Amino acid sequence: MKITTRLLAFLVLVLAPLALLSSAPAPKRAAAKKGQYLAYVGTYTTKTSSKGIYVFGFDTATGQPSAIEVAAATPDPSWVAVHPSGKFLYAANEAGKASTVSAFAVDGKSGKLTLLGQIPSLGEDPCYLSFDKTGKYVLVANYSSGTIAVFPILADGRLGEHTALAKDQGPTGPNKERQEAPHAHWIEAGAHNQFVYVADLGLDRVLIFKFDATSGSLTPAAPLTAKAPPLNPLSATLNPGAGPRHAAFAPDGKFMYVLGELQSAVTVFANDAEGAYRAVQQISTLPKGFAGRNDAAEIAVHPNGKFLYASNRGHESIAIFAIDAKNGTLTFVAHVLTGGKEPRNFAIDPSGQYLLAENQLSNNVVVFKIDRATGGLTPTGQVVEVPSPVDLAFWPRE
């Protein structure tokens, strides 16, 4: 299948006046118990029995989870992320036009969360949030409205007035049901904090913005240059109908792996000497001959940079790929069933020893041991019961 590159038709960028607010410093991390982590689970609360954000302990020496409990009651926290300082946790609360981003203080021993404040997400249905590399800003992707926003983190952990707001506009993909409009689904800062990357499911594109870490502002993608025709070095386009959902970078930043939800495929982009991302491979996350319904969901590169994992909702599996260190291309290794239905998300523990799969419709988190030599996954028999799990974030336990 031919991979094309199209220039973004329109991009509306709104830069908000900068408020004179104190930004959060980069405090030292608290001393952690060796191999002991807190695992925070984001959930959907609407039409489920979930109360909000859950937490359980996880011991990487044994692979044993501890008893799970409610860390904070909050509506539909579909994405959670722990600040690099370990002092704060932020959650995206999906609520249509009333969507918010919540800030919590973290108790590093018990895992309990204390609400610091909530602010509007400046869009509808935020589904992803992350931090810039300085830890001074929260980056938010609002799915239904196709907008992204940047918020400064104040010294007490609360979020200040936005420093940037952008709405994606332009030609949408061919899937009339899912690509009727722009849908920002993932946002991350690059390794050097100079660019912010946004996967837009509706546009079949990863948008790339210049990021100013001093002001928290974003600037539009640069126009075409004679050195790299016809590729815009600050955008990357997938096949029509791919529906980019999430992406992951190689540890050295040379390769970007974009998961297409609608076509259940990973597109590999290589970063060349001119700073442009060029598509070099597309590979399916499904076994040959599979004809059932499937929506690819999550993607992650193992900490050792040798393997890539992607989840399939429908086939109910994790696809495992080996990464070629020279050219970044993928070779299929295996499919492993997740032990439940609708694996919307999974997370690899920071030590790289375990993968935890969140099965949304079977209300469980299933633990797998990772073979760090082959990338293989083996279920340990450990299962954590939690209502409608859709995201998981690890943090070292004090």
Per-segment meaning from a language model:
Residues 57-63, 104-111, 151-160, 210-219, ...:
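Short loop/turn segments immediately following beta-strands, especially the blade-tip
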Residues 29-59:
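An edge-strand/N-cap motif at the start of beta-rich repeat modules
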Residues 48-49, 74-85, 122-133, 137, ...:
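Beta-rich, blade/repeat-based domains predominating
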Residues 66-72, 114-119, 172-177, 222-226, ...:
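A short beta-strand motif characteristic of beta-propeller blades
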Residues 66-135:
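Blade-loop segments of beta-propeller domains
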Residues 361-366, 373-398:
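Blade-level signature of beta-propeller repeat domains, shared across WD40, Kelch, NHL, RCC1
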